[in-house]
Amino acid sequence: FTFNNGKDDYNFSYNRHNLYSQEYKVHPLYGKLGLPIDFSELTQKQPFFGQVQLSGGKEIFKKNFQNNISSPVDRSKIKLPPYLPNNPVLIEEYAKHYDAIQITDKRVGEIINGLKENKILNNTIVFFFSDHGMRITRNKQFLYDGGLHVPLIIADFTNQFKPILKGTSNSELVSGLDI
């Protein structure tokens, strides 16, 4: 069983039914969008591949953005990178970015809990990654660290592979194409 509940605006022509078992809807900007997955549809004995796309930094554009933040970032404690001017507009931009991370963290927890509640977590490997940095100069569309250094977390709940010490950080180069 395969599913993708996010956009799949790939740069090639394809038939979505050849890639995913799940139905989809058409979005005017992003092409095809998968429908939200109900983890109870998956069983312990059925292998699956799923892609769950989170809004990430784009949460700030949603009307209820502020309502979803449990503890807003203290703007007075934000330290901007040395190459940026200490400007209230930039501080607010960074604060909203950090606030959006809280929402992403909550959504990831909901996914993990959904897998756990449906007794399929122990048979799952979760890959968490981002496509680019935040939407600010020297990030997202630029070949600087802010646009290239994105999170990659692999959590093996199956315990089938060589364990890596919890909290281990690795700075080796990984290509998103490999994932």
Please tell me what each predicted stretch does.
Residues 1-62:
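Catalytic-site neighborhoods of secreted/periplasmic enzymes
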Residues 39-176:
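Active-site-proximal cap/lid insertion segments
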Residues 179:
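Catalytic core of tubulin tyrosine ligase-like
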